[in-house]
Design a protein with these regions (language model features):
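Beta-propeller-forming repeat regions
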Residues: 31-34, 40-53, 58-524
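Polytopic membrane enzymes that build or remodel cell-surface glycoconjugates and lipids
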Residues: 19-20
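C-terminal motif of bacterial Sec signal peptides marking the signal peptidase cleavage site
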Residues: 24-25
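Short, conserved catalytic or interaction motifs in soluble domains
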Residues: 28
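Bacterial N-terminal signal peptides that target proteins for export
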Residues: 2-15
Length: 524
């Protein structure tokens, strides 16, 4: 018996070492779907007898962080997430009859395997493990007894009056400080300008598709990024254009065939004294994070990260070597915050600063010194719920990861918010401590009034007082911008309305594309 136990102990030790080495190799090597499948093929040829938990660590960990069963309820695992994962590994069963996947679901080759990379018996063990360990329901977010709805001393809500009958489908907001105008784009392929003084429409132009980002040029005109297709899609119809003036005739498309781009940034990445463009091509099953080299022959694409889900990037010289480095939020599968350290001449070294599980739902971030220690921290919201698991998740919310000075980040603040979508970090009360504004596009609809906007006022170092705004009613907000709208020296907030109900309404109501929160905080 002692000999048997020794042999079993040695076997278990070998299995554990194999799992550790395998997971490490996955995190180091897997850069795209092809490499994921190569890893899975190596797994399929193994004959180790593993438990469902051990198998999940290996198979699920091949493509992303291994999600524990506690992240989703039993029914969501059973009916949605697990079947899709099985199909991606090429294991097709009779349950898939009539289900669109692979090419039938607009997925290009390489997303869903064309051969099985997992044995049925191994899959059965993984499925049984998840369904046995998953809760029937996820825990609810407890009510915050300190949440304050008395916001009268903070912001005055202004709803612009607009007689136009148009759906509220705002995709872009940007305040032009010099012009004193608000630029607004919507899903109906139009770009508007609003007066900052009375919030009235001045003019508009037709554009090729829904806009996602804009940058005003020093000498006039602007750069514009359009998505091509706003809904989840692998079509490469997005465009980067330069407008010399606010006219639908005065523009040049500098780069087309972009895969659902949602954000751009600008910097000279290869030290040729030309401004290059950093693109977050969010995509769907496919996409990438890349940069366009501004060369004499046009803008040449250079790949940085070949995975979909790039949401937003920030340019910063992280190591103080005079070169522009990049920080990007990746929000699909291998979710996380990645830094790309410029190695000169446009080459980058990847650093994974933060990693999240694949149902985390990262949606927005900023890189700013929150605790006034001289080091820039990561402020992040997660709440994307337009996926395979559209249930209320108690781990959605606002997080602050403090920088220890060596770019090692520790979560130091968390406030749960269902469906947190976007954030603004700004010292709105000018007390020296940055505050945070958060919108939620996927709030708990059973919790009335909706918590679709929350304001976190930093009273002291990392001490926040949270305010709700019941007056904002049941509107849905997808975008947010800041700017001194009324010229009083204080930053105001603009919320961009996006509500499909207004698109399909039998009788269209008045157009309410945005709401202004006028800053009324007394400056001491």
């Amino acid at each position: 018996m002692r000999f048997y136990r020794s042999i079993k102990s040695m076997y278990n030790f070998g299995v554990n070492v194999f799992i550790i080495l395998f997971i490490f190799s996955c995190s180091e090597k897997s850069k795209n779907n092809k490499e994921d499948f190569e890893i899975l093929e190596g797994l399929r040829n193994q004959s180790l007898e593993l438990s469902g938990k051990e198998l999940s660590e290996m198979y699920c960990g091949a493509c992303h962080l291994n999600p524990p069963p506690s992240l989703l309820d039993k029914n969501t695992w059973k009916t949605s997430v697990l079947p899709d994962m099985r199909r991606r590994m090429g294991l097709i069963t009779e349950d898939d009859f009539g289900v669109a996947f692979g090419a039938d679901a607009d997925a290009p080759p390489g997303v869903y395997a064309t051969q099985s990379y997992i044995k049925q018996k191994d899959w059965d063990l993984i499925e049984a493990y998840y369904l046995d360990q998953a809760p029937e329901n996820l825990p609810a977010i407890p009510k915050d007894p300190d949440l304050d709805s008395d916001n009268s001393d903070l912001f005055k809500i202004s709803v612009p009056e607009n007689p136009n009958k148009r759906a509220n489908l705002t995709t872009l907001l940007k305040w032009h400080k010099k012009e004193g105008l608000l630029y607004l784009g919507d899903r109906a392929n139009r770009l508007f300008r609003f007066s900052g003084s009375d919030l009235k429409v001045l003019d508009s132009i037709k554009i090729s598709s829904p806009p996602s980002d804009i940058r005003f040029r020093m000498g006039g005109g602007f750069d514009l990024l359009t998505m091509g297709v706003m809904d989840p899609s692998n079509y490469s119809l997005g465009k980067y254009s330069i407008f010399e003036a606010f006219s639908q005739e005065a523009f040049v498309v500098k780069k087309d065939s972009l895969t659902r781009p949602v954000h751009f940034a600008f910097a000279d990445l290869n030290q040729d004294n030309e401004e290059d463009v950093i693109l977050s091509n969010f995509g769907h099953h496919v996409g990438n994070f890349s940069w366009l080299e501004n060369s004499p022959t046009g803008f040449q694409a250079n790949l940085i990260n070949n995975r979909p889900g790039a949401r937003k990037s920030i340019v910063s010289d992280i190591n103080n070597d005079g070169l522009s480095d990049l920080i990007v939020l990746m929000t699909q599968a291998k979710e996380g915050v990645y830094a790309y350290i410029n190695q000169d001449n446009g080459k980058f070294k990847e650093e994974n600063w933060l990693s999240f599980h694949p149902v985390f739902g990262s949606s927005d971030f900023d890189f700013v010194d929150v605790d006034a220690d001289g080091y820039r921290d990561i402020v992040l919201v997660n709440g994307d719920n337009a996926d395979l698991s559209p249930i209320l998740k108690p781990y959605h919310g606002l997080r602050i990861f403090l920088n220890d000075g060596d770019y090692s980040f520790k979560e130091s603040y968390f406030y749960p918010i269902h469906g947190a979508t976007a954030l603004l970090v700004e010292d709105f009360d000018q007390n020296g401590n940055p505050d945070v504004a958060v919108i939620s596009y996927f709030p708990d609809t059973n919790n009335q009034p909706l918590q679709n906007f929350l304001f976190f006022r930093q009273m002291d170092k990392m001490t926040f007082k949270t305010f709700s705004f019941p007056e904002l009613g049941n509107w849905s907000y997808l975008t947010m911008e800041k700017g001194d709208i009324n010229g009083d020296g204080k930053m105001d907030i603009i919320l961009g309305g996006f509500d499909f109900k207004t698109l399909y309404a039998k009788t269209p109501g008045n157009w309410v594309p945005f709401v202004v929160l006028e800053n009324k905080i007394a400056i001491e």
